[in-house]
Amino acid sequence: MRPEVANATNANDTFLNCSSLTSLAGEVGACKSYTQELGFDYEVVHSIIIVVVPLFFGIIGILGFAGNLLVVVVVAANPGMRSTTNILIINLAVADLLFVIFCIPFTATDFVLPYWPFGNVWCKTVQYLIIVTAYASVYTLVLMSLDRYLAVVHPIASMSWRTENHAIQAICIMWALILAVSMPAIIIHGEVTYVFQKPNGQSENLTVCRFLNEQYNWTVFQMTFFLTSYVLPLVLICIFYMSMLISLWRSARDSAESRRGRRRATRLVFVVVGVFAVCWCPIQVILVTKSLEVFPLTTAMIMVQIVSHVLAYTNSCINPFLYAFLSDHFRKAFRKIIYCRPRAEVNNRLGPPTKTTRATNSGNNL
């Protein structure tokens, strides 16, 4: 498909036709020559972007790659940490790794440059991967919450369900559905070349990667994405947690150690979910208001959007730090890997994955 060519008599045309998750970059860059028509100071915004975006996105990229890779290595290398919850944690780390590798570098470039330099195919690919990884992350959290719900509310009945094989099968089904459902993102995003007419009669062409809203309804897309990638999963998670917390704190038939194990695992998942909700809330709200064309284009609000992007992307690197802070097993395993301790010593410290322990405490082995 050839990129679109659109005429724009002023920069606000570009602002009303932005992409889904990387819109600010194209907007600011495409408006460079038309500052007088905007409600914000382009020079101030641009000077902040070229410093803040490379710095913070670079830090997020490095920490996200190293931290999530460390999570995968730690769980894979330590049989004592194999559990349904930790398999789901690996999947969450993989989703964050994909986002860090394939989305953050190109989004950062799109912020800094006034045009999209990677071509139409990669424009569609990056937008598709952003949607896929966003869905993969949040619905992995739903699976983690479901796993905790079964472990707490139905600890005996769910023993045959909460196995590593079933967790892997659930993850595969989830990825297959997400990859299929997200396919429209490839169609509705693409390159658009704006032809700006300058006051002196000359024209300036700027190619950006964005939502093709001349053909498709961006409001419908953004509202659908907001509901299915944020509201719906968080509602499901809240239902699971309300049920399990009532059961957890009222339970008296299990041993104190068993209850403590479930509470530790449940607390970890709860914190990870809470951090996700906080990190993604601002940018989700901003994108919805922009799709409804009620987002004020002022210098202050654009700064808010930049901070919101940084906050959302920070979520891709923060989970390993949460595991290290909240889980003794993860903290010890991280130290052993970082300080290159022998694998046998790591496994001895973490404890053997005995059949009895795995059968009764699957998912609590954090």
Model-inferred region functions:
Residues 199-218, 226-229, 246-285:
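Intracellular effector-coupling site of seven-transmembrane GPCRs
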Residues 49-78, 98, 238, 242:
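First transmembrane helix
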Residues 32-44, 111, 115-131, 154, ...:
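Loop architecture of class A 7-transmembrane GPCRs
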Residues 1-41, 196-202, 256-263, 328-366:
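Intrinsically disordered regulatory tails of 7TM GPCRs
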Residues 275-281, 285-288, 304-354:
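Seventh transmembrane helix
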Residues 46-58, 84-146, 150-164:
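Extracellular TM2-ECL1-early TM3 structural module of rhodopsin-like
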Residues 61, 91-100, 104, 171-182, ...:
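Alpha-helical transmembrane segments of multi-pass membrane proteins
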